[in-house]
């Protein structure tokens, strides 16, 4: 197989057959993987190791999803529940930072080893759980190059008519370029579930009614105030002129009624960009005023500052080389509430518009904090020391390549993961056929806010944010990765998998997607060997192979 040179952010690497310029060509593979998330990479690596010929087909030019787009402060949960190739990834990250040349802007000994629920570096284990985006991308590229994985970038699935099915199986998928990818089996590794939906597989968008599966943490969460992403007891007026309803609502407020706790809807938790910032002036791009900037969008934040809000920098999470993975924190933050509702089912053109709108909102927020006179001077001065990291996302002016799609479509599969699986409460009879675990989750039930509304008392408040602790790691059932057999027999979905909104809030972490991608490819290898539907894979054999490959399937195997 011919190797094509693929330049990436300041260095040259080699990836097998990265196709950007061929059109109207037919390709044949054992396994076609659509998407660029970490699950796509782990699936391709595992498929190759098991003797299959995979191809990754992805719209993105950078493979690795959010792990290469700013999410470097890993939501690891219990690190002992992360095994197999996913753990190998974090070991490779650790080894990358053992090289002196990795520390360009900071001495290694000056790095504070803090992480999300764990140390950034676990020296005894040889793993590292925080990293710069370009380092993650280099690891993924080297991983794929070692196996000569065929990667086709810049390829958008024709979602209207590109999926050809015969006798309940996908035969081929076509992209908007006119290329056709034929395969025996397929994996949807997108955050949105685009291939799954185009193949006619049932899915959900938004929040189920809590009564459907007997869940407490699903549906409308009005009155639930977890974390600190809300307006506390400040009694902030939602109106442009405080206390005057005739003046109209401030920007970024949903005019709908508070609603009923537990009631389902199609609202989607908020997205943001995980921005890689730096306070090192040698490597900093100052925040600039975005197109269409309007400080009125951030009026509610100004009112929070007037009430004494002082947590602006709470989620400027430090990674190596004086950089951050900057997430959201506080009552009005980087999450653009309401901007996510359309995304899962939107056209590519509409998603591009929404991505720009998110960027303008978020860049406007940073500019507002650094410049607006309503912001306390000490906060403005502190914010002005921050900017985008010049050596990250170089092709994109220091801004992340991808928005953080925290939740898109969710498949309705053979089994539906619910909060009961995560919390250890009795399963609901409607969850479907259970096979057994093919990986573990351990993060809390975590949903970001869904909307900002006016309370019955006439004040502004947020709704949808939950953070419910998971006592122990739990198994993620193989049945949640496969569609109902009547809908498709040769597709596995390790990212937009079958889970309720509540359960997905725990599952939806990058290392979990990575380990599920490996499990999906392992299942495909057995299905291909036996000529079976993915729903008919021998689970005991699958589980045995996963354990042999270092995957963690039960709590007794977990080690911190």
Predicted regions mapped to residue ranges:
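Bacterial N-terminal signal peptides
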Residues: 10-20
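Flavin (FAD/FMN)-binding glycine-rich loop and adjacent Rossmann-like elements that form
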Residues: 137, 153, 171-172, 179-185, ...
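Conserved N-terminal/central alpha/beta ligand/cofactor-binding core
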Residues: 52-53, 58-162, 204, 212-214
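Aromatic pocket-lining residues of Rossmann-like dinucleotide-binding sites
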Residues: 47
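Boundary at the C-terminal end of the N-terminal hydrophobic targeting segment
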Residues: 22-24
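N-terminal Rossmann-fold NAD(P) dinucleotide-binding loop
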Residues: 40
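Beta1/beta-strand and adjacent pyrophosphate-binding region of the FAD-binding site
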Residues: 27-37
């Amino acid at each position: 197989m011919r190797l094509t040179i693929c330049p990436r952010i300041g260095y040259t690497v080699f990836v097998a057959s990265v196709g950007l310029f061929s059109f109207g060509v037919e390709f044949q593979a054992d396994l076609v993987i659509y998407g660029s998330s970490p699950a796509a990479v782990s699936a391709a690596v595992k498929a190759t190791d098991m003797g299959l010929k995979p191809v990754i087909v992805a719209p993105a030019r950078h493979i690795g999803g959010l792990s290469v787009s700013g999410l470097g402060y890993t939501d690891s949960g219990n690190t002992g529940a992360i095994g197999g190739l996913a753990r190998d990834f974090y070991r490779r990250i650790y080894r990358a930072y053992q090289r002196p040349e990795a520390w360009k802007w900071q001495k290694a000994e000056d790095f504070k080893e803090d992480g999300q629920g764990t140390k950034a570096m676990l020296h005894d284990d040889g793993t590292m759980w925080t990293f710069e985006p370009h380092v993650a991308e280099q690891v993924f590229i080297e991983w794929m190059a070692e196996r000569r994985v065929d990667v086709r970038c810049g390829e958008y699935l024709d979602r209207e008519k590109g999926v050809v099915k015969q006798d309940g199986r996908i035969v081929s998928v076509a992209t908007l370029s006119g290329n056709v990818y034929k395969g025996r089996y397929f994996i949807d590794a997108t955050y949105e579930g685009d291939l799954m939906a185009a193949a006619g597989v049932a899915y959900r968008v938004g929040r189920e009614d809590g009564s459907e599966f007997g869940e407490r943490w699903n549906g409308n969460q009005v009155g639930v105030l977890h974390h600190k992403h809300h307006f506390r007891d400040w009694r902030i007026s939602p109106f442009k002129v405080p206390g005057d309803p005739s003046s109209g609502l401030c920007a970024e407020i949903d005019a709908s009624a508070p609603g009923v706790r537990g009631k389902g809807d199609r609202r989607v938790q908020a997205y943001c960009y995980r921005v890689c910032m730096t306070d090192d002036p040698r490597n900093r791009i100052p925040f600039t005023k975005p197109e269409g900037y309007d400080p009125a969008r951030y009026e509610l934040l100004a009112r929070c500052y007037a009430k004494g809000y002082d947590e602006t920098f709470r989620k400027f999470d430090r990674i190596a080389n004086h950089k951050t993975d900057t997430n959201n924190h506080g009552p009005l933050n980087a999450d653009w509430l309401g901007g996510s509702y359309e995304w899962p089912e939107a056209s590519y053109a509409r998603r591009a518009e929404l991505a720009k709108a998110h960027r303008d909102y978020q860049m406007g927020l940073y500019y507002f904090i650094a410049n607006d006179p309503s912001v306390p001077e000490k906060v403005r001065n502190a914010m002005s020391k921050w900017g985008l990291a010049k050596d990250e996302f170089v092709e994109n002016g220091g801004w992340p390549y991808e928005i953080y799609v925290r939740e898109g479509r969710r498949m309705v599969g053979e089994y539906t993961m619910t909060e009961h699986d995560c919390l250890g409460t009795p399963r609901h009879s409607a969850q479907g056929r259970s096979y057994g675990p093919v990986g573990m989750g351990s993060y809390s039930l975590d949903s970001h806010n869904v909307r900002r509304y006016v309370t019955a008392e006439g004040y502004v408040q947020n709704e949808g944010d939950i953070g419910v602790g998971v006592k122990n790691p739990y198994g993620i059932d193989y049945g949640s990765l496969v569609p109902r057999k009547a809908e498709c027999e040769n597709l596995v979905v390790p990212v937009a998998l079958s889970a309720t909104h509540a359960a997905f809030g725990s599952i939806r972490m990058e290392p979990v997607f990575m380990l599920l991608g490996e499990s999906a490819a392992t299942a495909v290898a057995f299905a291909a060997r036996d000529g079976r539907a993915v729903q008919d894979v021998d689970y005991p054999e699958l589980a045995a192979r996963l354990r042999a490959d270092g995957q963690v399937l039960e709590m007794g195997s977990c080690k911190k």
